[in-house]
Amino acid sequence: VRVVVLALVAQVTLSQHWSYGWLPGGKRSVGELEATIKMMDTGGVVALPEETSAHVSERLRPYDVILKKWMPHK
């Protein structure tokens, strides 16, 4: 019985890995995610390449980039 308990404890302690800023299960805390989004959304204006549009600028937000990546037809 002791050997089984020791084996289970060793398995749990060796397999448990938490990265800094992450909760168990690979989930981030909401506050840190919100801070990351705010840091990404600096409000800067990004110029598009000249092949796409001549001197046209548009403001890119993180969710706009994600939408364009997953739904390019829109």
UniProtKB/Swiss-Prot annotation:
Q: Which GO terms describe its cellular component?
A: extracellular space
Please provide the record's keywords in A-Z order.
Amidation, Cleavage on pair of basic residues, Hormone, Pyrrolidone carboxylic acid, Secreted, Signal
InterPro entries associated with the record: GnRH, Gonadoliberin
Give the source's domain of life in one word.
Answer: Eukaryota
Q: Which GO terms describe its molecular function?
A: gonadotropin hormone-releasing hormone activity; gonadotropin-releasing hormone receptor binding
Say where the protein is mainly found. Answer: secreted
Signal sequence annotation: 1-15
- List localization entries: Secreted
Using the record's annotations, give every residue carrying the modification Pyrrolidone carboxylic acid. 16
Where Glycine amide occurs, the residues are 25
What's its job?
Answer: Stimulates the secretion of gonadotropins.
PANTHER family in the cross-refs: GONADOLIBERIN, PROGONADOLIBERIN-2
Which family does the UniProt entry place this protein in? Answer: Belongs to the GnRH family.
Q: What is this protein called?
A: Progonadoliberin-3
This chain's source organism reads: Oncorhynchus tshawytscha
